[in-house]
């Protein structure tokens, strides 16, 4: 089932409603990080260039649903877009019963979460949104894993529902990495807990050639290998699960390597003194915060030989420089690799920024939860809806 792409449609004179992910941090009425806004501009500009009357909607923050709260207003986003686009951009507060929009202008709807029923994918609300447009464009990969009125329901009732360029690009990159990857396929999964990434680890251990774990997740695997992890964050109840994942990977000719050396400290703080130890020398009062240089080099070699790299999560507490060398080495190896690489997840993107490798990663995913659910092998509700409407 093919998904209809916005770029293939004739939009001349059409009312086009675009769902973007414009959920950006705002301080004192000013947008403080504009990455998502910049990512959405090409889609809005393309719709304008195609002669459409453009309406844009998004959520912003977590207001109480159904209640207006000026703290979560889209006004700062409107102010930003008004400067970035060479056309009229205005905010519409009461839009569900109809809104005037002319060809060549952009109307931004007030925060969709001010509407009661948004999160529950309310059918009456979805139909009201759908009645506003000739074409609905889903372009918000970051919210594609949520079945809500503005991301799912509206698309089921709109005359035409299609994928915007940003969403299409995202799905193409993820498909390239997971559906038909150049081998060896290497996945790096970091983060603090195995429990939050268990389904990702299970899904990936069945398709990747090499699975690398880092951060707090690695501590559980270190414990599963029989080593002391001291006072480190780990999940004792998931040790058997970790052993099963290792056995699963090895049965396919892969592995989940455990670090041979680690960086430890006695406390979690920006000023904690870092000590390098062999993995079998970790003491009862030690906390593991990073992989050591030997382990980092071993992982860099795995990355160098990869055909495809999927990166989700740092391998240490890189926010503190003394525990950032492992993640820095991984980032450098990915940057130096000629493999197709995709990075996603908030902490990962922070590491990409910190080590300045954004232009060296083949594709940077805008989705956090959606990226994870895609890695888990789940079909995202927004994608299922677009396939249904494209059939």
UniProtKB/Swiss-Prot annotation:
One Pfam family assigned to this protein is PGK
For this UniProt record, the keywords arranged alphabetically read as follows: ATP-binding, Cytoplasm, Glycolysis, Kinase, Nucleotide-binding, Transferase
| Record-linked Gene3D superfamilies | Phosphoglycerate kinase, N-terminal domain
Q: What class of enzyme is it?
A: transferase
Annotated GO CC locations: cytosol
Pathway per its UniProt entry is: Carbohydrate degradation; glycolysis; pyruvate from D-glyceraldehyde 3-phosphate: step 2/5
Q: Which PANTHER family match?
A: PHOSPHOGLYCERATE KINASE, PHOSPHOGLYCERATE KINASE 1, CHLOROPLASTIC-RELATED
Q: What does the similarity note say?
A: Belongs to the phosphoglycerate kinase family.
Share what the entry says about its subunit structure, partners included. Answer: Monomer.
This chain's protein is named Phosphoglycerate kinase
> Which species is this UniProt entry from?
Shewanella sp. (strain MR-7)
Q: Which gene encodes it?
A: pgk
């Amino acid at each position: 089932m093919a998904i209809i792409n916005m770029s293939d449609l004739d939009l001349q004179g059409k009312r086009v409603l675009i769902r973007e992910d414009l959920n950006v941090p705002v301080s004192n009425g000013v947008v403080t990080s504009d990455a998502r806004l910049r990512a959405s501009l090409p889609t809005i500009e393309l719709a304008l260039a195609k002669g459409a009357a453009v309406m844009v909607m998004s959520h912003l923050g977590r207001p109480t649903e159904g209640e207006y709260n000026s703290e979560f207003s889209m006004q700062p986003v409107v102010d930003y877009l008004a400067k970035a686009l060479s056309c009229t951009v205005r905010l519409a507060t009461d839009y569900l019963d109809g809104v005037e929009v002319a060809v060549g202008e952009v109307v931004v709807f007030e925060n969709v979460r001010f509407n009661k029923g948004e999160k529950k994918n309310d059918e009456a609300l979805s139909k009201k949104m759908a009645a506003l447009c000739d074409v609905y464009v889903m372009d918000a990969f970051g919210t594609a894993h949520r079945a809500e009125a503005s991301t799912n329901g509206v698309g089921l009732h709109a005359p035409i529902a299609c994928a915007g360029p940003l969403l299409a690009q995202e799905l193409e990159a993820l498909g390239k990495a997971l559906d038909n990857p150049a081998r060896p396929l290497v996945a790096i999964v970091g983060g603090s807990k195995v429990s939050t990434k268990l389904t990702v680890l299970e899904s990936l251990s069945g398709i990747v050639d090499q699975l690398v774990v880092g951060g707090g997740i690695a501590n559980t695997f270190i414990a599963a290998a029989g080593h002391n992890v001291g006072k480190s964050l780990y999940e004792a109840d998931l040790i058997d699960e970790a052993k099963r994942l290792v056995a699963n990977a090895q049965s396919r000719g892969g592995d989940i390597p455990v670090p041979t050396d680690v960086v430890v400290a006695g406390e979690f703080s920006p000023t904690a003194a870092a000590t390098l130890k062999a993995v079998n020398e970790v003491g009862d009062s030690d906390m593991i915060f990073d992989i050591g240089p030997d382990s980092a080099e071993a992982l860099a070699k795995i990355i160098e030989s990869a055909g495809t790299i999927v990166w989700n999560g740092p391998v240490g507490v890189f926010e503190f420089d003394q525990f950032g060398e492992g993640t820095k080495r991984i980032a450098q190896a990915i940057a130096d690799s000629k493999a197709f690489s995709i990075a996603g997840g908030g902490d990962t993107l922070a590491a990409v920024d910190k080590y300045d490798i954004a232009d060296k990663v083949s594709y940077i995913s805008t989705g956090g939860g959606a990226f994870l659910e895609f890695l888990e092998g789940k079909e995202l509700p927004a994608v299922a809806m677009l396939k249904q409407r494209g059939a």
